[in-house]
């Protein structure tokens, strides 16, 4: 992340002068510093600014910059004193054993079983607690399993000093003076995920900025050059990048990120809050399953954590001198985001959908399309064929329930291999609901541990989910993700009793799917249910296409059990939903670029958009450059 600090001076001075002129003496400002995309105001009387929030709101409206209030280090109590003060302010039954302090931000995050109960039991206002402790507080739901969050917080705590300097460097890079005030020029270079699924990556270039949108792997590619994004053809150095922005946590979109840090990238990574722990889990699992063949190390993953700046949805954020980013929920998986990129002084606006589901589901309410301006839309096409029409969601659920019941009634086993982020949680919730209603034959539901780990992160960030699920996470005695009907296992050995197994898909070594296939292969009345998209080259795709002989450790196994595909539950949009989404933006669009789909599906969707909606449409291959403006 190289830059010339000499170009920053006048711009920085203007920003700081405007802030100082706007602040009353009572604010007790001690310093102003860049904090990544934010401007941080440090005060030894932070309660004044927190109480008089209109002062900051007015400055934000004037400067068009994100401003945050920080407590000066001199007024912060020690962590032990702070916890003692907190405990004295709440009822005795409230447990504060999962409180994580972040010295870099002067914030403490309290994870608690009942956040509403803590709020109601606190004696005194939040402002008073900030005054007493010198720390700002965030409350979050305590998950059933906290180890992923604990690992993240441990890394952040250990690198607090490093992050303080990193945030300053990023801020100087973002708020540097522009090279030119001439109208923006912008282009996209396709590095992966075009006319193919996985290794999503593209480079957005302006005369001021270089921003990498997504950074994925294709673990099922046959050719080495098809596994990684083609950054080698961009002609730029790794530290010429201003930022990396991730749409979501799946390895197909985030799996290459630690490799960048391994080879020297030291810039920021932007994503939604839940994406940070989810991608950390995904990348760690990738190493664990790689048998020593991973392209990066756990240390590289930690470095990525340190350089990640999570963003709230719907907040406009400067990520370079001429690009502003806004993330909105794409409703694909927890934390998945569409990116709205505002280039220059309104010269051009790009929306990249990432992967999107444009309908309601048990986990999400369908995504918004309310963008003020969007000239270029980059839209996925996983199900871009005209024939890719899903049944109604409730009908799909009933078909799943009927399929499962038909097998369980014969005292047999149902195996459901699904991605462990997204559909695994939805199917678990569906089964929990229908068992409670007495509409599924009584049987054990076995869930692999990694799926439960992911579900725990859903509990922490339940505000990203549907209103109903969010309410249940906070208010029910038992979270819907901790159902009493689910049993956690790791590569379980099956007995003779009926069972439903929800196991992860898309792991590099195809485990634990192979483990269960070997046990089920000769049970002719057992069943494999395929409910998600199957990657080309994967074992799931081979089975879906009718292959019944597979190699296990050099031994050929014949799959004799039933294989059934259930349409309509996948976490993508079907053809009609994609067309509907594009049509909602039709009056604003100048161009649509279609990506993330097998080539025939990409071509079909692009042709349909052009023919039916009369919008200029492109479906580039990898290694193409497209001028936007």
Give residue spans per PLM region.
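Metallo-beta-lactamase
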Residues: 162-183, 280-336, 463-496, 562
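Active-site neighborhood of phospho(di)ester-bond hydrolases with catalytic His/Asp-centered motifs
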Residues: 212-216, 241-257, 269-272, 327-331, ...
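RNA-contacting regions in translation and RNA-metabolism proteins
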Residues: 1-119, 125-157
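Active-site-proximal loop/helix segments of hydrolase catalytic cores
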Residues: 331-336, 342-374, 380-390, 512-516, ...
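Core dinuclear metal-dependent hydrolase active-site scaffold
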Residues: 156-239, 310-365, 492-493, 512-515, ...
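Pre-active-site segment of Zn-dependent metallo-hydrolases
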Residues: 194-199, 203-267, 271-277, 282-308, ...
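Cap/insert and terminal regions of metallo-dependent hydrolase folds
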Residues: 359-447, 527-532, 550-612
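Hard-cation-handling environments
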Residues: 400-538, 550-551, 595
């Amino acid at each position: 992340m190289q830059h010339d600090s000499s170009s920053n001076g006048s711009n920085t001075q203007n920003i700081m002068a405007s802030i100082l002129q706007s602040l009353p003496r009572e604010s007790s400002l001690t310093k102003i510093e860049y904090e990544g995309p934010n401007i941080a105001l440090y005060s030894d009387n932070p309660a004044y600014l927190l109480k008089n929030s209109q002062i900051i709101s007015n400055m934000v409206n004037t400067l068009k910059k994100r401003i945050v209030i920080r407590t000066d280090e001199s007024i912060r109590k020690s962590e032990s004193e702070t916890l003692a003060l907190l405990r004295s302010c709440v009822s005795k039954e409230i447990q504060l054993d999962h409180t994580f302090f972040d010295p870099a931000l002067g914030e403490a995050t309290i994870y608690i079983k009942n956040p509403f109960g803590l709020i109601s039991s606190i004696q005194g206002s939040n402002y008073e607690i900030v005054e007493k402790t010198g720390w700002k507080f965030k409350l979050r739901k305590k998950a059933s399993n906290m180890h992923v969050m604990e690992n993240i917080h441990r890394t952040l705590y250990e690198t607090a000093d490093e992050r303080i300097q990193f945030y300053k460097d990023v801020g100087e890079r973002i708020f540097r003076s522009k090279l030119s005030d001439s109208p923006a020029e912008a282009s996209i270079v396709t590095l992966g995920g075009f006319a193919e699924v996985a290794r999503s990556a593209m480079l957005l270039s302006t005369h001021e900025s270089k921003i990498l949108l997504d950074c994925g792997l294709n673990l099922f590619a046959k050719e080495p050059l098809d596994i990684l994004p083609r950054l080698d053809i961009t002609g730029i150095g790794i530290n010429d990048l201003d930022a990396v922005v991730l749409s979501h946590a799946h390895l197909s979109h985030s799996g290459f990120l630690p490799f960048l840090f391994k080879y020297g990238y030291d810039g920021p990574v932007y994503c939604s809050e839940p994406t940070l722990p989810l991608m950390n889990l995904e990348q760690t699992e990738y190493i664990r399953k790689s048998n020593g063949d991973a392209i990066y190390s756990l240390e590289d993953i930690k470095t990525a954590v340190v350089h990640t700046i999570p963003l709230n949805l719907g907040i406009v954020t400067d990520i370079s001198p001429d690009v502003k980013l806004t993330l909105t929920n794409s409703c694909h998986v927890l934390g998945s985001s569409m990116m709205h990129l505002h280039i220059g002084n309104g010269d051009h606006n790009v929306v990249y959908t990432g992967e999107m589901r444009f309908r309601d589901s048990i986990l999400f309410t369908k995504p918004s399309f309310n963008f003020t301006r969007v000239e270029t839309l980059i839209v996925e096409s996983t199900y871009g064929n005209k024939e890719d029409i899903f049944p109604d969601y409730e009908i799909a659920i009933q078909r799943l329930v009927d399929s499962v019941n038909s097998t369980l009634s014969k005292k047999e086993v149902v195996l459901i291999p699904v991605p462990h982020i997204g559909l695994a949680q939805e199917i678990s919730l569906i089964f929990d609901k229908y068992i409670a209603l007495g509409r599924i034959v009584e049987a054990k539901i076995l869930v692999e541990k990694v799926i439960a780990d992911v579900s725990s992160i859903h509990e922490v960030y339940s505000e990203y989910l549907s209103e109903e699920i969010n309410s249940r996470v906070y208010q029910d005695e038992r979270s819907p993700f901790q159902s009493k009907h689910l049993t956690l296992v790791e590569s379980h050995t099956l007995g003779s009793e009926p069972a439903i197994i929800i196991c992860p898909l898309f792991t590099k070594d195809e485990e634990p799917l192979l483990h269960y296939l070997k046990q089920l292969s000769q049970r002719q009345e057992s069943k494999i249910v395929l409910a998600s998209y199957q990657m080309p080259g994967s074992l799931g795709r081979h089975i879906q296409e009718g292959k019944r002989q597979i190699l296990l450790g050099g031994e050929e196994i014949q799959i004799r059990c039933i294989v059934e595909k259930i349409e309509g539950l996948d976490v993508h949009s079907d053809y009609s939903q994609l067309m509907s989404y594009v049509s909602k933006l039709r009056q604003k669009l100048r161009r649509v670029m279609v990506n993330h789909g097998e080539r025939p599906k990409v071509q079909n969707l692009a042709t349909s958009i052009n023919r039916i909606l009369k919008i200029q449409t492109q479906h580039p291959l990898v290694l193409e450059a497209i001028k936007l403006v």
